[in-house]
Structure formats: structure tokens, C-alpha cells
Amino acid sequence: MFAQQQHDRRRFLGWAALSLAAVWVGTRESVQMITMKAFRPSGAGDLASFGRATAWLNSPPLTAADLRGKVVLVQFGTYTCINWLRTLPYVRAWATRYKERGLVLIGVHTPEFAFEEDVDNVRRAMKERGITFPIAIDNYRAIWNGFGNHYWPALYFIDASGRVRDHHFGEGHYEESELRIRELLAAAGRDGGIDAEAVSFEAHGPEAGADWSNLKSPETYVGHHKAENFASPGGAAVNTRHVYAVPPRLRLNQWALSGEWTQKSEAAVLNAAGGRIAFRFHARDLHLIMGPAARRRAVPFRVLIDGYPPNTGHGGDIDDHGNGTVTEQRLYQLIRQSGPVSDRQFEIEFLESGVEAFAFTFG
């Protein structure tokens, strides 16, 4: 069950002509079926308990009794999830706009990777993202299971009597979500004087919406447990030090290691300076979830795209020459293209050992 839940984040991938992140489920349901399911009335019952939260950020512990009489919006996420990151501009804006009307927004941080269980990592990430609403740390998935949830991100809409009225899985449907908040506030008699216009803002970095029409590369895990399309000759040498090579040619969405790595369950760990990862991708944005293998270690790296520095195509975590430094365990935005999008070859070289690479995501 745990492995299935860990894999569920991959259900949220973008497809052309959809206004939301479509759900790519193991049952291979059609995109049309998933779209209809993404936002629908819920008969899920009463608000589940937060009593088994590991810790709380930005608030003392909250209970269902504390929230009675309030309209509550609960969002599940984990801080390296690109789909969750892209919802944040809306969620932050709703938390601010409707707070005085009685809306309580609660984030539930249910980790995917082991390093996301570290409360200090989560606290730092929430601060960097400007998140001031309450966050329940759900390291044991007690809240996740209480809601019967399976997705990052997921929204649950709770009325003032403590009943779950709606849910929405994935990105998109933001205006519909905001309208549902307003309807629940109106039912509680708390909607007076609210501006009729939906929230508006300009999102930046990994929080900016994906270019769905050009997104043809899926989230790809680097650890051996869920790795796909790995193309280094000989395949993965599981849990042992091994010298890998990049083949002369990669097909779209294939990736490979070069240098001495240990492929562990969640991540590939670099054992010697000069290790590389290559990925043939098709997307406007490329991100890599990675971090130093030891605290307070900084690992410099250099990025190339089709063999050259990215220049104006660099992401927010590198300069135009492709230079950057891994200093903490998080998602790094490495490529943000501004021109036409085509199949490109990404390569990252680490100038020192001691980095862990977990997953590629795209936008």
C-alpha cells in the first residue's frame, strides 16, 4: 500500500488541450473520465481528525472541534511536488482573501521522499514559499488515510458544519474551486462584501503554470525502485558502487548516468567527482529534485543543453553559463526555455561527489 501511495504523485501529468493537470492513473482510465472526476461533489462525511499529526507549523494543533463553524479548505501536498508548487499562488491568495470571512486553510504535508519527513526541511520550504497558514505534518500518513486520499495535490472543501462537500485532485479548475469556497462561505453567512472577481497574480519560477501543449516528458524517478527509461549500458547495479556510461544516443525520455554512482531505492548517490546525468526531454521547463548527501555540504554543478550552456534558457537555480550549487534537499529549476520547444539533450555534471538525485519533473 505504501509503495502504491508513493507512486501516486506521477498521476498528475499535463496533456494538451486540458486546463488542468490530467491524472495519469495505473488503471489507464481515459483523460476524459479523469477530467470529470477531478472536481465533483463529495459525500465523504465528516472532517477527518488531525489528532495524529506529527507536528504543526504556523499554528498550535487544530482539531475538528476547533474548526466547527468555520469553512475549511484542506490541501495535501509535499514540498518537492511540482504539481503542488504550481497550485500555491492560488492557495496563498485564497488564504489571504477569505481569512477574515471565516475560511481556514490547512495544508497537510504528507512526504514522498524520506528527506521530506524532516520537519526542519519542511519549515524552511514553507518559509521560502511564503506560506503562513497552518501546516499539519503527516509523516505517518494518518491524516492522508483518514481522508482516504491518494493524490498530491488534493483539495477538500469542508462546510461550517464540518462536512466534506467537495474535493479536487490535481492542478486546474481554480475559478471553480474559488467559487466553491464562496458558496460555502455564503451558506455560513460570511460572504458579504467579497469582490466578485477571481484572485489574480503573476506566478514565477516553478510556481508558474506549465506549458501543457509542449509537455511531452513525464516525471521520472532516478532511484532504482521506480526508475523507468534508464539507458546506461548494462542497466542498474542496485545498491552497489558502479561506474556508468551515457550511450552515444538517447531516445526521447531516456536518461543515463555517467561516472561512479550507487543507485539506491529513492535516489542515485554520486561517489566520485565528475559524475553526470543526461536526459533527452521535450518540455519548456526541467527540474531535478536533489540534495547533498551530508548536511552543510555544497556540491557545485554545471548544466549543458545540447552540449552548450543554456544562456537565456537557464532556470532560476543556475546562471546563464549553467553553473549552480546544490546546498539543500529540494526541487531545483534548471531549464526554463523562452523560445520554441523541441527535443533537447540535458546534461548535468557534478564537480564534486556527495550529491543525491531523486527525480526529474517538467513543465
For each predicted feature, which ranges?
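Short, glycine-anchored, charge-dense loop/turn motifs used at functional sites
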Residues: 156-166
